[in-house]
Amino acid sequence: NYGYTFGSGTRLTVV
């Protein structure tokens, strides 16, 4: 349950 945004704007969301 946390999110991470890459420099290119791609978003990764994990439980």
Swiss-Prot record:
Record flagged with keyword Metal-binding: no
Primary location group: membrane
Location in or out of the cell: Cell membrane
Record carries keyword Membrane: yes
S-S pairs: none
Function: J region of the variable domain of T cell receptor (TR) beta chain that participates in the antigen recognition. Alpha-beta T cell receptors are antigen specific receptors which are essential to the immune response and are present on the cell surface of T lymphocytes. Recognize peptide-major histocompatibility (MH) (pMH) complexes that are displayed by antigen presenting cells (APC), a prerequisite for efficient T cell adaptive immunity against pathogens.
Protein name: T cell receptor beta joining 1-2
